[in-house]
UniProtKB/Swiss-Prot annotation:
GO terms for cellular component: extracellular region. Residues 49-59, 67-78 have a biased composition (Low complexity). The modification Tryptophan amide is found at residue 33. This is Red pigment-concentrating prohormone. InterPro entries: Adipokinetic_hormone_CS, AKH/RPCH_hormone. Belongs to the AKH/HRTH/RPCH family. It is found in: Secreted. The keyword Cell cycle does not apply. Pfam families: Adipokin_hormo. It comes from Callinectes sapidus. This hormone adapts the animal to light backgrounds by stimulating concentration of the pigment of its red body-chromatophores.
Length: 109
């Protein structure tokens, strides 16, 4: 009985290794996709307005964070308002606190 389960385990392991070696995936990220989508149509559910609301100072007004330059044309975002960066930071921090609280409740409960 032990020998049979060992053989079964070996066959399953070989099957998994074979399947994993034949699978491949590629993930591509283009930082300009959002700008193209926002400018593509006028009636896009407010996406264009939301994007333009995040970048009120394209000309380089004070109070913005300027991202590093890009080597490909059309990827120049302009300055990013500090308030937008701080809002994202607060969201991430609050979610991290919530996750820690959930983990504490799980271990203590």
């Amino acid at each position: 009985m032990v020998r049979r389960s060992g053989v079964t385990l070996l066959v399953v392991a070989l099957l998994v290794v074979t399947l994993m070696s034949s699978v491949s995936a590629q993930l591509n990220f283009s930082p300009g996709w959002g700008k193209r989508a926002a400018g593509a149509s006028g009636s896009n559910g407010g996406v264009g307005e939301a994007v333009s609301g995040l970048h009120p100072s394209v000309g380089g007004a004070p109070g913005g964070v300027v991202p590093p330059g890009s080597s490909s044309p059309g990827d120049s975002c302009g300055p990013i308002p500090v308030s937008a960066v701080m809002h994202i930071y607060r969201l991430i921090r609050s979610e991290a606190v919530r996750l820690v609280q959930c983990q504490d409740e799980e271990y203590l409960g």
